[in-house]
Amino acid sequence: MILPNTTATTPFLNALWQGTAHQGGNTSGLARRSPGGDDSQLEALYILMVLGFFGFFTLGIMLSYIRSKKLEHSHDPFNVYIESDTWQEKDKAYLQARVLESYKACYVIENQLAVERPNAHLPEIKPLS
């Protein structure tokens, strides 16, 4: 396992401090230069925070609205009917009744002559061409 080298940053920080201390004798140069690089990071953080709060606020409103609608209409007869399985059973029974009704309404007319003489020649209509 490779351990991280934590002492490598110390010479870099010392050199940076020496360079800024010799420029003006005070640390105001460092204070003037650092905000330029950090502003863009802070701006991105600010935008992410605003979007996060907006998303959290919108999600909260949406969930509370859905919950209130669910509680408001929980005892509505239509919703109770939809949530129950009785409509599926009734629909299935209705479909079976319709199939039986249509089956009973269909009938076949039997041609007695065709049944008595199955090998007899039946006349065909020839198309005009």
Curated annotation (Swiss-Prot):
UniProt-listed InterPro entries: K_chnl_KCNE (IPR000369), KCNE1 (IPR005424)
Positions of transmembrane segments: 44-66
Record topology, Cytoplasmic segments: 67-129
GO molecular function: delayed rectifier potassium channel activity; potassium channel regulator activity; transmembrane transporter binding
Residues modified to Phosphoserine: 102
Function, as annotated: Ancillary protein that functions as a regulatory subunit of the voltage-gated potassium (Kv) channel complex composed of pore-forming and potassium-conducting alpha subunits and of regulatory beta subunits. KCNE1 beta subunit modulates the gating kinetics and enhances stability of the channel complex. Alters the gating of the delayed rectifier Kv channel containing KCNB1 alpha subunit. Associates with KCNQ1/KVLQT1 alpha subunit to form the slowly activating delayed rectifier cardiac potassium (IKs) channel responsible for ventricular muscle action potential repolarization.
UniProt protein name: Potassium voltage-gated channel subfamily E member 1
Organism encoding this protein: Felis catus
